[in-house]
Amino acid sequence: MASSSPLQAAAGDRLLPGGPGPSPEAEDDPGEGFEFDDSDDDEDTNAGPDVPRSALETEADTPLIHLDSAPVIDLEPKPEPAQPQTQRPAAVSNGDAVDAAFSEVQRSGWRRKSSRRIERFTFPAVEEDVIYDDVPCENLDAQQPEAERNQPYEDARQDRAPQEPEDLGWSSSEFESYSEDSGEEAKPEAEPTKHRVSFQPKMTQLMKAAKSGTKDGLEKTRIAVMRKVSFLHRKDVLGDSEEEDMGLLEVSVSDIKPPAPELGPMPAGLTPQQVVRRHILGSIVQSEGSYVDSLKRVLQDYRNPLMEMEPKALSARKCRAVFFRVKEILHCHSMFQIALSSRVAEWDSTEKIGDLFVASFSKSMVLDVYSDYVNNFTNAMSIIKKACLTKPAFLEFLKRRQVCSPDRVTLYGLMVKPIQRFPQFILLLQDMLKNTPRGHPDRLSLQLALTELETLAEKLNEQKRLADQVAEIQQLTKSVSDRSSLNKLLTSGQRQLLLCETLTETVYGDRGQLIKSKERRVFLLNDMLVCANINFKGQLEISSLAPLGPKYVVKWSTALPQVQVVEVGQEGGPYDKDNALIQHAGAKKASAAGQAQNKVYLGPPRLFQELQDLQKDLAVVEQITLLVSTLHGTYQNLNMTVAQDWCLALQRLMRVKEEEIHSANKCRLRLLLPGKPDKSGRPISFMVVFITPNPLSKISWVNRLHLAKIGLREENQPGWLCPDEDKQSRAPFWCPILACCVPAFSFRGLSLQLGALVHSPVSCPLLGFSAVSTSLPQGYLWVGGGQEGAGGQVEIFSLNRPSPRTVKSFPLAAPVLCMEYIPEPEEGDGRNGDKGCPAADASAGVHPTICLGLQDGSILLYSSVDTGTQCLAACRSPGLQPVLCLRHSPFHLLAGLQDGTLAAYPRTSGSVPWDLESPPMCLPVGPGPVRALLSLEEAVWASCGPRVTVLDATSLQTQQSFEAHQDEAVSVTHMVKAGSGVWMAFSSGSSIRLFHTETLEHLQEINIATRTTFLLPGQKHLCVTSLLICQGLLWVGTDQGVIVLLPVPRLEGIPKITGKGMVSLNGHCGPVAFLAVATSILAPDILRSDQEEAEGQQAEEDKPDGPAPEPAPVPASHVGGELIRKKGILLQYRLRSTSHLPGPLLSVREPEPADGSALEHSEEDGSIYEMVDDPDVWVHNRPCARDAHRKEICSVAIISGGRGYRNFGSAAGSPGKPAPCGETDSTLLIWQAPLTL
C-alpha cells in the first residue's frame, strides 16, 4: 500500500527543484503566435537553467500516480518497514482527486519570499522518514475509530503524502529534499508514531488559536506559530537570506465540510446604517464564497484531470505552468474564509471587519503569490492557445468542461477572476465605509483596509502592465529578422512600450470614397513608432475559450521625432482646410478632377456627398429666390421672406455638416511620416490615416505621442530617478514629464521673489481637437510676488497651448504672499442650511474669483473669467497684519494673519461672493503667526507654531487642538489632505508627518533626506518648503531645490506612503517656493463620435426638448421629412412666422376658417420646414442621455516655483543644455502628466 520512495510517489505532481513556476527561459515564451515545437520531450529539456538534467529525466520517466495504479517500485529497493495500522480517510491519496472530498479540504499558510524561486519548508529530521502511501485504502473510514474520525485536524501529519487536487496545502515537492538527500532506511514505526501522536494536539491547539486569534490580528497568530512550531524553524535557504522570514503553516480541515459563513437573524432595533452594513457583509461573504468555489473548480475540474489524463493532453510541465500559483491563492482565501466565519458569527456584538482585511491581505505572501499569478497569466493563456491549436483532445476537453459546468464559464473566465478580485473587494469596502459613521470602532480599520487593498491592486496592475509590455515586445521582436536594425533596437532592453492598440488603416480617394482599409497593430515605444500587419492562423472559434493571440509582420517603423500629427481644420475652417496635399500611403495618384480642385477629402464619403448635395441645393434655392422676387402677386408662404429663410436654413445645414465631418475626424488619426527621398534628393513625406475605435482612443494617441517626444529631450533623459534602484528599472509611464521652463516675471531686471501661484481653469472653445490633447490644462496661471519692502507684481500666463505665454502683468502696492482660487458656488453645497450664511443667488451671476493676500494686510478680490484684472473688492486686515495664508469654505473666506489671528469674512448673496466691507470675525489661534490653513468638509484646520487647532466649518467654534510637533520652536508650515489623512511639513527638519482627519492620530512619519542623499551626498540638513498632493502622488519641495515624488493612495483610505518614491533630476538653484497644480476637464462633447452625434440628433428629432410653437404634423406630413431623412439631410432651423405677412396662404388644401381656433401654421408648413424653435439645433447637437454618464478627461500639470533652474543629472563641469533662466531669476518649472482617461 505504500511505495518505498516518496520522490516517485509524487513525481507527476511536484514542482521542479529549480523553481515552482514556469522558467522565463522556457520554450513557451509569452505571446508566441504559432511557431512552436509540439514535442513534450524537447520542452522538458528547456525547463529552466536551475533544474539539473537528472531531475528532469526522473520526472519525464516517472508516471503519474492514479487511484487504481500499482505502487511504484524504486530503482534501488530498500527494506520496507512494517506498515502502520493507523487508519485514515478514504478520500486521501498522494496527489489524486476524489471529487466528493475536494471542497472539504482547505490548507493555508505563510511562505518565505524569494527573489528567484519559492523556498520549501521541511520537517525536522525525526519526521523525515515518514512513509507516503501511493494507493489509498478503500472504506477505511468505517474501520477508523470514532474518536479519531471526530478530530477535526487529525490528518495534519498523517504518514502519507499530502493531497494534490483536493489537498489545498503542500504537494509532495515540499518534502522531496528529504527523499533525495537522505540515504537512511526507514525507521521502525514506533518512533514516527510517537512523534505524530505528540504533534496532533499541538496542531489542534494552534488551529484553535488561529481561528480565535483573528480577533487580535493574524500577525500575533503568525508569531506564535513561528515561535512554537519547531519544524517551521528549519528550512532550505534557496534564495536571498536577507528576505523577510515567513513560515508556512499547513492547515487541513476534516472531511466534514465546515459550515459556510452565515449571518444570524437580524436583531431588532438596528439603525438604517447597521442594516446596510449587514447587507454589505452578506455580499462580502457571498462574493468570497463564489470566488473560492471558482478557484476550486480550476483545480478540480481542469488541473487535476489534466494531470491524470492518459495519454497526456497537456504535459505535466505545461500544466503546472498554466495553473501556476492557483493553489497558493486558494490557500490565502481559505484562511481568510475561516477568519471571516468567525467574524460573521460575532458580527452583532462587534461589527468589525476592517482589521480582518488588514491582517489577511497586508502580508507580503499575498503580494508575492498574486504577483506570480498575474505575471504568468499571459504565458498561461499562450500555452492554452497553442494547445487548442495543435491538440484536438485538449480543445475537446475544454469544450466538454464548459458544457458540463453549471454556469458555462470557460477556463479563461475562471482564471481571470484573481485579477479582478481586489477591485471587487475595494468596491465592497467603499460601500461599507460610506455606511460607517464617524467614531465607529471599525471606521479606522476600514480605511486602513481600503489603503492596503488599493496599494495591492496598484502594484498588481503595474506588474500586469509590465508583463504585458514585455510580452508584446517579445511578440513584435519575433516578427523581425534577426539581422535587422529594428531587432537590435527591440532586444537592447532600452525600449519601453507606452501604448499599443489595433487601429484601422484607411485609404480614401479624391472624392472621399474609401479605397481600402485593414487592421494594423500600432506600437508606440519611448523613441519609435512601429506599425505591423496582423495575421491570425488556426481556429478562430477557440477565442471563446482562450484569447487568441496574433502574429505580427512589421510593415514600417520610424523614429518618433520624425512623426507629426496633422489635424484637419486646425489652421482654419473645417471645410476649407479639410484636405490633404500629400499623397496618402497606398493610394493612387489623384484624378484630374481632384488635381483641379487641389483637394483630397478624407472624411467619410457619406458626409462629403451630403455636403456636396447641400451646395448644389443652395445654388438652386438662390435661383428660386431670384425667381420669387419677380412674382407680381403677394402670397403668405411664397415670398422673399420665405425664400430667404430657405437660404439661411441650407447655410446652417452646411455648417452642421461641416461640424459632422470635423466630428468624424475625432476618430481619425493622421500621421505624417518621412519617406524615401526622390531622385533629386528632396525629402518626401507620406500620410497614414488610422481610424481609432472612439474619440477617447485618438485623444490618448495624440497625447502620448506629444509627451513621448518631450520625453526624448535632454532634460528628461532621465527626468526621474528612484533611490537604490536597480539598473533595469525606469520611471513609470505615468510619471510627469518636464514640459517647459519659463521665467516667472517678464521684468528680469527686478529681483522679484515668488510668493504664490494659482490656476484659473477657463475652457477655450477655439482650440482644435489635437490642440486640446497636447496643450497644458486650459486656463490662466496667476503668479504673484514682489520685492521685500517694495511693491508687488502679478503675472498672468495663458496655458491654451503646449507652452505658457504671458498675456498680462500689473503691479501692486505690496508683495503678494498668498493666493486662493475660488470657483463659482455649486448648488447643494450646504449653505442654504445656515441662516447666517445666505446662499448666493444664481441669477446674480457669481463668477470664479481669485483672492490675493499682500504683505501690507490688503486682501484683493479679482475676477478670473477674463484677463481684464478688474478688482471686484478690497479690504485691509485687522491691524494691517500681513496675510500669510488664504482658504475658502462654503461659508467663509479665511485669512491667517501674522499676529496669530484668523479673520473670517462671510459669504454674501450679491455679485461679490464675500463681504469684505464689514469687519471680519476675528478668532485668536495662538501667539505665533498662522502659517497654514486647511478646509475640510466639516472642519477647518489652522496651524500656529507646533499646534493645530480644529474649528467647526460653520460656526468656527474651536473643537479641539493637538500638537503636531514636540519642539515648541518648530511651526507647521504646510498641510495637504488626501483621503482620510493630512500630511504636514514643518519649518525645520526634513520629516513630514501624517495625521488622521477624524481621530487626529499620528499615523506615519517620513524622512525626505533619505531620498535625496544620492543627489546631495554632502548635505546633512534638509528642510521641506512645499507640499502638494495630486493624482495619487505627494510632491515634496526642499530648500535645496530638489523635488521628491512619493506615491500615496487615491481613495478614501489612509494616505500612507509605502513605496520608495522618485527624485526629480530637474529642480531649482534655491528653495522650492511653492508647488501648485493646474487641472482642467475636457468638455464631454469632444468625446462624441459622428455615429453618436447622429444618434443624438435622431433622438432630438424623435423627442423634441422644450415646447414647440407649432403642432405636431399628421402622418401624411411625414412623407417629405422621411424622404429628406433618407438622404441624410434634415432641414431644421428657426422659422420666421409668416402669418403676419399679407396675402393668402399658398396651398393645395382648402383655406382654414378665419376664427380664433385656426392654427398659426398648417401641416404643409411643417412638412416643408421641419420646424424646431431652438437655434441651438443649428450649430450644436444636444447630448444624448448616455453622455451624462461619460467619464471625464482630466488634464493635469504641476508647477514649481523657485530661484533659477538646475539639472542634477548633468555631470559636474559638463556644459549641458543652456538654462532658459538665470540662477537668480524666479523660474517656473512645468511638468505635464498624461491625460487621465
Swiss-Prot record:
Lineage: Eukaryota, Metazoa, Chordata, Craniata, Vertebrata
Annotated segments matching region Disordered: 1-117, 132-203, 1091-1118, 1142-1164
GO molecular function, one term: guanyl-nucleotide exchange factor activity
Protein name (database record): Rho guanine nucleotide exchange factor 10-like protein
Biased composition (Basic and acidic residues): 146-163, 184-194
Complex formation: Interacts with RHOA, RHOB and RHOC.
Keywords: Cytoplasm, Guanine-nucleotide releasing factor, Phosphoprotein
Keyword Repeat appears in the UniProt entry: no
Compartments it resides in: Cytoplasm
